[in-house]
């Protein structure tokens, strides 16, 4: 017996029952993004490896360990995108979108990272990305936060997440802070795990992300970045906090919150939940004003965030908030003889044309009326249209409403009129 080929580790299939929740989330998020005047952008899953190396930073986990990179047939190094912000910025630069106007954009799609698969973290995962390019004030930071808050409220999960906020200042202030952190963590090097020991020498900021309980105690007493950030970043953060207070947005300042990518600056934020274990961030983002310069163009202020679809689905399912769906079939068409099949197909296409929002199913059986009606009941069909030899001979159609038991025969040319009447009842 041949070995069954299975999906790649860390990459998942989503069957129709799973997709119902995904589609519900996508519908809500897209509706709200449209409400806020954000436009969709699409860009490739594969980019030149150098794009990410220049932008993310050579000493991040993504560059060092997690990227899916390989050489194409021309020996050029390419990478499956590990996140969407950089590709979005590149696309906007290449297409000249930032020459004439500011951009408010969104995208949805798969990202790829070679991580150890675990609950809520996969090697292929999906993100809703929200990006604003060309705006620098705290007011646009506020808009992004308001937008995500609205999404969470509409999905009925806002009571189960907490917004955490911080400022990581400028690149220069972080360089100074890294030296302070190095000196602090160096005292506890013997207590650090192997990963944190490595981070100590390449990027001590990343130690702040450790989930190890023993290391958490050391982190809690570490110097805070807010004490070392530049005045401009501090004023920006204070103004944002004032705006949020005036609007009435609940948040906590987490002085240990940093982002895993080097291009971030100033405002950073995460929505976290305690219902999904250690991998608790549902949405994360911040400002990345210097990303454009790392891509070789002029300064373009920017802010964005990414909503993790898989984690959002897990949270909704854990709360038993799975959306109610109507899987019932509106019209089930039955034919009783093989030689009537063409007439039945024509009828089904006519009904689909006239009622494009209704669910129309054509029976695959051509005999045994009892079995066909049994099928109609199993699929929760509301209306059955029956074509038998007598109906075809007399140019008739039999309609039966399985909800009320009402049935009626009528001339074929009355089908639209009769269905409209049946749908109203």
UniProtKB/Swiss-Prot annotation:
Family under the similarity heading: Belongs to the class-II aminoacyl-tRNA synthetase family.
SUPFAM superfamilies: Class II aaRS ABD-related (SSF52954), Class II aaRS and biotin synthetases (SSF55681)
GO terms under biological process: histidyl-tRNA aminoacylation
Name of a matching Pfam family: HGTP_anticodon
Recorded catalytic activity of this chain's protein: tRNA(His) + L-histidine + ATP = L-histidyl-tRNA(His) + AMP + diphosphate + H(+)
Enzyme Commission number(s) of this protein: 6.1.1.21
The protein's name: Histidine--tRNA ligase
Main location group: cytoplasm
Cysteine disulfide partners in this protein: none
Keywords for the protein's UniProt record, in alphabetical order: Aminoacyl-tRNA synthetase, ATP-binding, Cytoplasm, Ligase, Nucleotide-binding, Protein biosynthesis
């Amino acid at each position: 017996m041949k070995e069954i080929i299975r999906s790649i580790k860390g990459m998942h299939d989503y069957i129709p029952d799973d997709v119902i929740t995904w589609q519900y989330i996508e519908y809500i998020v897209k509706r709200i993004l449209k409400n806020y005047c954000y436009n969709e952008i699409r860009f490739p899953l594969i980019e030149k490896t150098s794009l990410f190396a220049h932008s993310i930073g050579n000493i991040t986990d993504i560059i060092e360990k997690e990227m899916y990179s390989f050489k194409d047939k021309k020996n050029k190094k390419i990478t499956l995108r590990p996140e969407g912000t950089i590709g979005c910025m590149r696309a906007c630069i290449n297409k000249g979108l930032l020459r004439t106007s500011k951009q408010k954009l969104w995208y949805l799609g798969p990202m790829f990272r070679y991580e150890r698969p675990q609950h809520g973290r996969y090697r292929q995962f999906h993100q809703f990305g929200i990006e604003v390019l060309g705006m620098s004030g705290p007011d646009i930071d506020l808009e992004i936060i308001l937008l995500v808050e609205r999404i969470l409220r509409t999905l009925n999960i806002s009571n189960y997440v907490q917004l955490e906020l911080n400022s990581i200042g400028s690149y220069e202030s972080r360089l100074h802070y890294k030296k302070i952190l190095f000196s602090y963590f160096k005292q506890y090097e013997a207590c650090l795990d192997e990963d944190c020991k490595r981070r100590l020498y390449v990027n001590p900021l990343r130690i702040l992300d450790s989930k190890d309980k023993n290391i958490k105690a050391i982190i809690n007493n570490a110097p805070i970045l807010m004490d070392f950030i530049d005045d401009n970043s501090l004023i920006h953060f204070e103004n944002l906090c004032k705006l949020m207070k005036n609007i009435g947005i609940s948040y906590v300042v987490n002085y240990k919150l940093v982002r895993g990518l080097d291009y971030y600056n100033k405002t950073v934020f995460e929505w976290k939940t305690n219902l999904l274990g250690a991998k608790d961030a549902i949405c994360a983002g911040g400002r990345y004003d210097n990303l454009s310069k790392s891509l070789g163009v002029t300064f373009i202020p920017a802010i964005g965030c990414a909503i993790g679809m898989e984690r959002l689905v897990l949270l909704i399912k854990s709360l038993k908030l799975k959306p109610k769906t109507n899987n019932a079939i509106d019209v089930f068409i039955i034919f009783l003889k093989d030689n009537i099949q063409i007439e039945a197909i024509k009828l089904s296409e006519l009904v689909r044309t006239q009622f494009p929002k209704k669910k129309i199913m054509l029976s695959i059986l051509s005999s045994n009326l009892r079995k066909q009606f049994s099928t109609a009941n199993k699929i929760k069909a509301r209306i059955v249209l029956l074509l038998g030899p007598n109906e075809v001979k007399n140019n008739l159609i039999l309609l039966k409403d399985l909800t009320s038991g009402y049935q009626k025969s009528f001339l074929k040319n009355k089908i639209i009129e009769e269905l409209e009447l049946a749908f109203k009842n």
